[in-house]
Design a protein with these regions (language model features):
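Periplasmic solute-binding protein
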Residues: 1-19, 27, 38, 45-71, ...
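Short helices/loops that flank or line small-molecule/ion binding pockets
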Residues: 11-12, 31-35, 109-123
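Extracytoplasmic/periplasmic substrate-recognition and gating elements
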Residues: 14-15, 88, 96, 135-200
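A local structural motif
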Residues: 14-19, 73, 92-107, 119, ...
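Short helix-initiation/N-cap motifs at beta->coil->alpha
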Residues: 23-28, 101-116
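Glycine-centered hinge/linker elements that transmit conformational signals in sensory
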Residues: 30-32, 73-104, 148
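Paired acidic/hydrophobic, glycine-rich loop segments that form the ligand-binding mouth/hinge
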Residues: 42, 121-126, 144-146
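Short, solvent-exposed loop/beta-turn-alpha elements that line the ligand-binding surface or hinge
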Residues: 45, 62-85, 135-138, 150-159
Length: 201
């Protein structure tokens, strides 16, 4: 399931904001929204994986895919100056107050209502959030999506796209039924039912 930036098209239009493709444009859009009384970015960071997604994009766009993979494999320490540069970019969003207030007390789902009711304009999130946006009344007319913008020119635009998988443990005591269960889960009709809840492809 891919990640990126979901945004309120109508709020962007009302404030004369075009979809940002560079970091400077993104930060400028945040400043315009903040000045208009709109929280630029909603987030729920009660469970920290949501902030990991933001970090991943900042690092991928600042240092590139190969660096990011080496960092996450432990081959490069988080004390590396290039990682400091990532947090410097994050500071450009945190210090001016571009994230939702009190986000540390909210789960990711609880950060969706501010965007639905127009208090916030963007959410860096996966496509599983779309079902909740639409349940809240947003439509394709006012809900848009854009690629996280470029930070370091020339670095290829790698994407955040986790994959959820299910496996049988090597030491499982009932591998026969576990295999039957995985076969059941892989049926098209079961996948269709699961995806009604998960909101994923």
């Amino acid at each position: 399931y891919q990640w990126g930036v979901y945004y309120r098209k109508d709020i962007f239009d009302a404030n004369g904001i075009s979809v940002p493709t560079t970091w400077d444009e993104f930060v400028a859009a945040c400043a315009t929204l903040k000045a208009a009384g709109v929280t630029p970015i909603t987030i729920g960071s009660k469970y920290l994986w949501t902030t990991a997604g933001v970090f991943d994009y900042l690092n991928l766009r600042t240092n590139g895919y190969e660096f990011h993979m080496a960092l996450t494999k432990g081959e490069i320490p988080y004390t590396d100056p290039r990682v400091h540069a990532v947090f410097d970019k994050w500071d450009e969003l945190v210090k001016p107050g571009y994230f939702l207030e009190n986000h540390a007390s909210l789960a990711w789902q609880e950060a969706i209502p501010p965007m639905i009711n127009g208090e916030a304009a963007m959410y860096v999130m996966g496509n599983f959030s779309v079902a909740l946006f639409k349940e809240g009344g947003l439509t394709n007319d006012n809900l848009g999506f854009f690629q996280f913008p470029e930070i370091t020119p020339g670095i290829p635009m790698a994407e955040e796209a986790p994959t959820d998988t299910m496996h049988i443990a090597s030491g499982a005591k009932n591998k026969t039924d576990a295999k039957r269960f995985l076969i059941f889960l892989s049926r098209a009709d079961v996948q269709e039912e699961m995806n009604k809840t998960l909101g994923q492809l």
